[in-house]
Amino acid sequence: MLYECIKESAMKFQTRLLHGKSVQSYEAGATVPAISQCNAYSYESSEQLEKIFQNRAPGFAYTRIGNPTVDAFERRVNELEGGMGAIACSSGMSAVTLSLLNILQSGDEVIAGSGLFGGTLDLLHDLEAFGIIVKFIPRVEKALIEPLISEKTKVVFGEIIGNPGLN
């Protein structure tokens, strides 16, 4: 790691973001991570690759799942946010889908504003086929949300600037 001699607690935010604990050291002394253009990775054995696919060992199996470039980006975002981890998604819809599918299960409820991106509206309607109840409200406002909250409510979903009416 670059700047190993500096204690991380002494680093200011910008320095920590560039060189903090979550940021990997780079090959050949590079000051930024290389852009990985590899689409597949080889390993000594199929057992080693199987462990990577099952998330029982670190490594990369296929670039759409992850690669060193995306890993460096996720580590920096995590450092920026001070989180437990980060996942980079290829689109906003993949981020929304991953978020909802990791929180919800059959029998859960969602309260959602009706002024959402069309793909998000479609996803929410599709979730109903899996036993997830979606309650739509015209605007994301506390007065409209509170009466709908139940023990089964897991998500209140809205957009900062709703489509198409900007409400």
Please provide the spans of the model-predicted regions.
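N-terminal "arm"/small-domain region of PLP-dependent enzymes with the aminotransferase-like
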Residues: 2, 6-67, 75-76
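Short acidic loop-to-helix transition motifs that present clustered carboxylates
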Residues: 93-96, 139-144
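Buried hydrophobic positions in well-ordered alpha/beta secondary-structure cores of metabolic enzymes
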Residues: 29, 77, 95, 110, ...
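Conserved N-terminal alpha-helix of the aminotransferase class I/II PLP-enzyme fold
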Residues: 45-97, 119-126
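Short amphipathic alpha-helix with an adjacent loop that forms part of the alpha/beta core around
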Residues: 143-153
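Conserved PLP-anchoring active-site segment centered on the Schiff-base-forming lysine
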Residues: 102-118, 137
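Active-site core of PLP-dependent enzymes with the aminotransferase class I/II
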Residues: 162-167
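A glycine-rich helix N-cap at a beta->alpha junction
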Residues: 127, 131-140
